[in-house]
């Protein structure tokens, strides 16, 4: 079954009636300190000058402290995806294969494919834990592979425990492989272990401000690694003129009020996750793939409904203005079976989604 494609982001931005619940972005009222940092940077016309290539020292130190990785270093970039692209392009001549998951985030695989590196996307949708396992990876790994772990996993919301992560690290170490630990959604998880603590010699951690702090449009993130490892891959940076100064000022301000902000953010996110789970259960239209998601989104399986994911997302947007994401964006194998709903949004947005689910999906 085919359906009209969803409108472009530019077309959606031109509308004033869209409820943004499809990009995993945070839409709560920002912390006043973040807004003031942006305003002050603008008043000082800092947008007229370049930032330090690696980012402001204060920001780099705050990122490392947030991750609790003493002795590590951070390189600030214009978004975590820029860091992923740089890592993929820099590591491509050194690695034999990229190992990732389906569902997952497709762009690292695309980056590596452009570089001529084979990509293996292992299926996890029907795995008991909805995650890559060490046994799966061991079946396909080659010497000097690159393993890409999204944790918590976008788009399902599952997260690795310390034992699972240690087993994967063991496979990586035995094959002298690199590991990218995409920690974009770490701040939403109840417990989170960083692979860098177990395998510092070949692990890169990617860090984003788009989700937990809501700075998606400002484009600021980082790559964190042991100093020698980071210096090696950043010897020729993709952007030697640095990430935007205004974005970095906002990120610094956010990290300075991190604990207070996360309390509000996590409480709101949990409330909205619960509301979405409840409406899915009460309507009987689909089922939540990972209950109690560890991220700011969840996936709803619609296999046993009359809907296909693209058609359902289009219908909900057209009829209610609520924008959610079809699974086809993130899973060639299973994408038609699920939709993804972002939850770090104002509670009334989540309630509007629930009304949309009752009126469209469950009809």
Name what the model sees in each region.
Residues 1-82, 86, 363:
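N-terminal small-domain helix-loop-helix segment of the aminotransferase-like
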Residues 205-270:
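Conserved core segment of the aminotransferase class I/II
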Residues 89-149:
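PLP-dependent aminotransferase-like
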Residues 96, 117, 174-178, 201:
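A short helix->loop->beta-strand "cap" motif at the edges of active sites that frequently abuts
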Residues 306-312, 348-353:
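Short, conserved charged micro-motifs
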Residues 126-190:
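Active-site phosphate-binding strand-loop segment of PLP-dependent enzymes
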Residues 268-277, 288-302:
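Conserved glycine-rich beta-strand-loop-beta hairpin in the small C-terminal domain of fold type I
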Residues 318-323, 330-363:
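PLP-dependent enzyme catalytic core of the Aspartate aminotransferase-like
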């Amino acid at each position: 079954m085919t359906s009209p494609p969803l409108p472009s982001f530019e077309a959606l931005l031109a509308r004033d009636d869209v409820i943004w619940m499809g990009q995993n972005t945070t839409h709560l009222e920002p912390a006043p300190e973040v807004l003031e940092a942006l305003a002050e940077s603008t008043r000082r016309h800092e947008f007229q000058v370049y930032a330090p290539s690696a980012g402001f020292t204060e920001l780099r130190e705050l990122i490392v402290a947030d991750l609790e990785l003493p002795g590590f270093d951070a390189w600030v970039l214009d978004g975590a995806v820029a860091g992923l692209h740089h890592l993929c392009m820099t590591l491509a001549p050194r690695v034999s294969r990229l190992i990732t998951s389906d569902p997952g985030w497709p762009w690292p695989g695309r980056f590596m494919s452009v570089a001529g590196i084979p990509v293996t996307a292992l299926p996890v949708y029907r795995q008991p834990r909805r995650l890559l396992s060490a046994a799966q990876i061991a079946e396909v790994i080659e010497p000097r592979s690159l393993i890409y772990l999204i944790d918590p996993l976008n788009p399902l919301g599952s997260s690795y425990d310390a034992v699972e992560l240690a087993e994967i690290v063991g496979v990586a170490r035995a094959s002298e492989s690199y590991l990218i630990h995409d920690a974009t959604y770490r701040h939403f998880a109840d417990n989170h272990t960083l692979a860098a603590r177990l395998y510092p010699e070949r692990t890169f951690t990617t860090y984003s401000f788009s989700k937990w702090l809501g700075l998606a449009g400002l484009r600021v993130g980082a790559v964190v690694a042991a100093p020698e490892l980071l210096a090696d891959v950043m010897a020729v940076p993709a952007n030697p003129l640095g990430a935007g100064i205004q974005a970095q000022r906002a990120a610094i301000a956010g990290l300075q009020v991190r604990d207070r902000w996360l309390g509000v953010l996590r409480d709101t996110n949990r409330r909205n996750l619960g509301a979405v789970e409840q409406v899915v259960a009460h309507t009987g239209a689909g089922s939540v793939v990972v209950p109690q998601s560890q991220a700011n989104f969840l996936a709803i399986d619609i296999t046993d409904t009359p809907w296909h994911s693209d058609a359902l997302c289009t219908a909900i947007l057209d009829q209610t203005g609520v924008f959610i994401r079809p699974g086809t964006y993130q899973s060639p194998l299973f994408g038609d079976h699920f939709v993804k709903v972002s939850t770090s949004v104002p509670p009334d947005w989540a309630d509007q989604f629930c009304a949309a689910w009752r009126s469209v999906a469950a009809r």
